[in-house]
Amino acid sequence: MIDKINNQTPKYLLLNSFASNPTKRNDYLSYRYHRTRKTERREEIQALAGSVIGTTVALLSFAKKQKTNPFKINYGLMELIGVSAGAIIGGVAGGVIKADPFDKKRKVNEGIFQFANASIPPAVVLALETVTEKSKMFNTKLGKIATTVAGLAGGMFAAAKVSNFIADPGDFEKDRKLTMKDSLANIDDAIGVLAMSDFPVLQKIAGPTLPIIYALCGFRAGESN
């Protein structure tokens, strides 16, 4: 038997424990992948198709508005929110097809978490940058880097709090916690901030990359249970 499962638990201990304790294995799967059972292939295909369609619709809409290539969109905060929302709504919409009420609720809740995690951190960074631009002390390259890091970190935890409150205002269930996988997935926030930057080279990197990352966020929401 092992202690509480976390990111530091050795894999061999997990495997040994799973062999004699199926409940512990389910706890690990729920912690690691935010699901209580293995996702069916049908659900994965539906979630992926939905997220790709949602991302594409959002991209085409902004591209038409800006009269440019979908992968050369000039990203501001509204574009970041719009594309992430399209991807996540699409992923959830695809994932809930033929899902039971319990799974539907979980997919919607994960969608709320993913959207908050994709939109709140860049908004916090933008707000901080607006304030620090007026300060000679912080309006430097080092100051902007510090502002970005602080904004992303603070925004991630704020997003978790907001999404947990929306999904479960009565606090009847255990909160959805940030995990290492979520932190790595937050590269979309870092790239999103780059997309709003004044550096053309960084914008070129962000433009083609953001839709792919947001589509993956939508897929994660749609296949979650």
What are these regions (language model features)?
Residues 1-225:
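Glycine-rich, hydrophobic membrane-spanning regions of integral membrane proteins that mediate transport
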